[in-house]
Amino acid sequence: MVNILCVHWGNKYNGTYVNRLYRMVSKNLNLPFNFYCYSNNNFEYNKNIKIIPITSNDLEIYWNKLAMFQKDFVPPGPCLFFDLDVVIQKNIDHIFNYLSSNLTMIKAHWKGDIITYGESRKRKERWDMYVNSSMLLWQSNKCTNIWEHFQKDPD
């Protein structure tokens, strides 16, 4: 069983994005899966979506993604996270072939050669990451060091 996750925090996206993501995964994943949404919203999600409530925390925007790396956040197994604005058009079974003991992220190839040692050649832009977190792949309980490090040093 694989774990599919998303985060629905705040009001940038409404709950229809969560339900739409669930439908795209259902259509394009042949593996058995559980779909989890880490949420602080009271939207009426699809009945097959398991809600993990965001308890009172000080995390904002994308920082809530880090909570997924807590110990026992979801049952054991592979975890695949998608941002709510991701569009899935084809089968995604093969993504799990990239599963390792580390976190797997998408290379931000679209940043191209404008990246030079973390600085963009374009004025007033800064690129300090060569990866994108709109899709993340990891084994549950194998990347707890990410959450633990963040808890020790949130800045």
Feature map (PLM): residue ranges:
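Glycosyltransferase catalytic domains, chiefly GT-A lineage
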Residues: 1-155
